[in-house]
Amino acid sequence: MVQAMIDMDIMKGILEDSVSSSEFDESRDDETDAPTLEDEQLSEPAEPPADERIRGTQSAQGIPPPLGRIPKKSQGRSQLRSEIQFCSPLSRPRSPSPVNRYGKKIKFGTAGQNTRPPPEKRPRRRPRDRLQYGRTTRGGQCRAAPKRATRRPQVNCQRQDDDVRQGVSDAVKKLRLPASMIIDGESPRFDDSIIPRHHGACFNVFIPAPPSHVPEVFTDRDITALIRAGGKDDELINKKISAKKIDHLHRQMLSFVTSRHNQAYWVSCRRETAAAGGLQTLGAFVEEQMTWAQTVVRHGGWFDEKDIDIILDTAIFVCNAFVTRFRLLHLSCVFDKQSELALIKQVAYLVAMGNRLVEACNLLGEVKLNFRGGLLLAFVLTIPGMQSRRSISARGQELFRTLLEYYRPGDVMGLLNVIVMEHHSLCRNSECAAATRAAMGSAKFNKGLFFYPLS
């Protein structure tokens, strides 16, 4: 009976051990926690387990323990495992977007404002391939050094003012001005007594009388018609004549243009018209001069600036007037290429502002005229260049001789028309259009123009 009770207690202990060591137990046998001081204080004295009581009873009765049983280790309080949560892969949290990760973080409020200073703007540098013709005395091309935007300290401002004053002082010394024209500290800046206010309002400026005109009689009806057409303003279509007709009337025309009777009158009349006319009128004068010079050369003649010729005597004046009017255009808008614009500006400066026609001719002789603006100016400078051929270079003489040979009536006006038409078909700038209208003028005011040639 006693043995049966012992066996039941042993089986009960084995079942308890199997339940405690199963995989569903929340504690592990190999992970035990040592009891703390608080646990010892709070815990009450527990009764010994049943197997210890049985073991004590057996030892007291002299019964040996079973051989196949392993003594159980004392288990302390084990740490509870964290609960395992099963989440669906469809409901997993998404990773932050890389855009927000690398984007600029915006903070609202005054405390989070960005205090980083804005980046400084770097000065624009001019491309090194841009060439400009400097205003030299020889008319050759020179490369201007690129201007760099540098900040000078305020200390150098006084030094710069001193340099300017010194330069002005040197220029005044070169002019050799009298002491009465030099300003001092107490003298007035200008003399108001020389203003003629006592004459009253002035509606017209005094103009000297033109040279006298002596009537001339020609037996040729065509020559008479040309002279009558040159004495009035009219449309260019009413003054048209073929180049073959001019070649046929060469002898009669030569006797008229080289006559001394009315040479001063006609030259004065043509200069007045050229000074007040636009590019259309001046282009018509250039067409007339080129056709007449071509006719003279074809008949074995030649011309020089000392010879008397009513048509060719005004060639230099017409050239200066044409280039001056041409500068009124918005050249930077009309010519978009930097090389073309540089050549146009330099030639225009030499002719119109510097009065250095020979240097402009030499410059044109050294470049290739592969654009319309340069070829137009070359045609305008052809007659003045041929008249000054003894002063210009050999390349310049060859250029103008070739242009005079290959010229056809209508080339000058055709180039001018195409330049304006092609540009303003794309340009919508109102200032450019206004400048073009002012520079072109009207072709009706052409007194002094004898004929307009046609091919």
From Swiss-Prot:
Q: What coarse category fits the chief subcellular location reported for this protein?
A: host cell
Query: Zinc among the record's keywords?
Result: yes
- UniProt biased composition (Low complexity): 88-98
Consequence the record notes for mutating residue 292 to P = Complete loss of dimerization
Question: Which InterPro entries has this protein been placed in?
Answer: ICP27-like
Instruction: Give positions of region: Disordered.
Output: 17-163
Record site: Cleavage:
33-34
Membrane-crossing ranges are none
Write out the GO MF terms: protein sequestering activity; RNA binding; zinc ion binding
Entry's Gene Ontology cellular component terms: host cell cytoplasm; host cell nucleus
GO terms in the biological process aspect are: positive regulation of viral life cycle; regulation of DNA-templated transcription; symbiont-mediated suppression of host PKR/eIFalpha signaling
Q: Which keywords describe this protein according to UniProt?
A: Activator, Early protein, Host cytoplasm, Host nucleus, Metal-binding, RNA-binding, Transcription, Transcription regulation, Zinc, Zinc-finger
Q: Which amino acid positions bind Zn(2+), per UniProt?
A: 333, 423, 427, 432
Does the record bear Kinase in its keywords?
no
Indicate, by first and last residue, each region the UniProt record lists as having compositional bias (Acidic residues).
23-42
Which ranges belong to the motif Nuclear localization signal?
Answer: 101-107, 121-130, 143-152
Q: Where are the zinc fingers (CHC2-type)?
A: 333-432
Q: What induces it?
A: Transactivated by ORF50 protein.
Its function, per the record, reads:
Post-transcriptional regulator that plays an essential role in the expression of viral lytic genes and productive viral replication. Possesses numerous activities that promote the expression of viral genes including enhancement of RNA stability, promotion of RNA splicing and stimulation of protein translation often via its ability to interact with different cellular cofactors. Stabilizes polyadenylated nuclear (PAN) RNA by cooperative binding to a 9-nt core of the MRE (MTA responsive element) together with host PABPC1.
Tell me more from the record.
Answer: ORF50 and ORF57 are the earliest genes expressed in the lytic cycle.
Subunit relationships: Homodimer. Homodimerization is required for transactivation. Interacts with host ALYREF. Associates in a complex with RNA, and host export factors NXF1/TAP and ALYREF; these interactions allow nuclear export of viral transcripts. Interacts with protein K-bZIP/K8; this interaction promotes viral gene expression during lytic infection. Interacts with host PABPC1. Interacts with host AGO2 and TNRC6A; these interactions inhibit host P-body formation. Interacts with PRKRA and EIF2AK2/PKR; these interactions inhibit host stress granule formation.
Q: Which family does it belong to?
A: Belongs to the HHV-1 ICP27 protein family.
Record note on domains: Binds viral intronless RNAs.
Report the protein name in the record.
Post-transcriptional regulator MTA
| Natural source organism | Human herpesvirus 8 type P (isolate GK18) (HHV-8)
